[in-house]
C-alpha cells in the first residue's frame, strides 16, 4: 500500500458520507478537535459541532452529491498529510455537474495512533470560481464529468 492510500481513503469516506447525507458518518471522519470550513465559509470546530452543523443541512436541504479528483497528496511528516482535490456537484434531479459550485477541497489528515487510522484535522471547501477565466471553469467541469461518467465518487 502506498503511503498516501489511507489519506485518499479518508477523503473518499468524507465524500461518501456527504453523498449519503450522513452527518454522523461524516463527523466520525474527524479528530475530536477537527475543523470544517464549508463552501459558503461556514465553520464548525469539533467533531460534535461538525455533526450538529451538518445534521440540519442534510435534513432540510437537497444537498448535491460530489464527484472529485485528487490532485495531490503530500506527506508533511509520517503522521500528517495534505490532500488537495477538485470536486463538482450534481444537483438533485439532474444528471450533470453544475460548474457554479465546483470547488477546491483541502484535507489535512493526521494519523490517529490510538485508533491506528487517519482522521481529518481540517477539511475546507473553496469555490473554484476562477473569475474571468471561463475556459478554466469549463476545463475543470469536463475533467469532473469524466470522473462522473466512470460512475465513481473519486479518482
Where are these regions (language model features)?
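A beta-strand edge to alpha-helix "cap/lid" segment located at domain peripheries
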Residues: 1-25, 35-155
Amino acid at each position: 500500500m502506498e503511503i498516501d492510500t489511507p489519506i485518499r481513503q479518508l477523503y473518499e469516506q468524507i465524500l461518501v458520507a456527504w453523498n449519503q447525507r450522513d452527518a454522523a458518518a461524516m463527523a466520525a471522519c474527524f479528530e475530536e478537535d477537527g475543523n470544517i470550513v464549508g463552501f459558503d465559509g461556514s465553520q464548525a470546530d469539533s467533531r460534535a459541532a461538525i455533526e450538529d452543523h451538518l445534521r440540519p443541512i442534510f435534513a432540510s436541504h437537497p444537498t448535491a452529491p460530489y464527484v472529485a479528483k485528487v490532485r495531490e497528496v503530500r506527506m508533511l511528516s509520517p503522521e500528517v498529510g495534505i490532500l488537495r482535490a477538485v470536486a463538482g456537484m450534481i444537483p438533485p434531479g439532474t444528471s450533470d455537474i453544475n460548474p457554479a459550485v465546483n470547488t477546491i477541497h483541502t484535507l489535512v489528515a493526521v494519523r490517529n495512533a490510538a485508533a491506528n487510522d487517519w482522521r481529518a484535522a481540517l477539511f475546507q471547501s473553496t469555490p473554484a470560481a476562477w473569475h474571468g477565466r471561463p475556459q478554466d471553469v469549463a476545463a475543470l467541469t469536463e475533467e469532473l464529468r469524466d470522473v462522473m461518467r466512470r460512475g465513481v465518487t473519486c479518482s
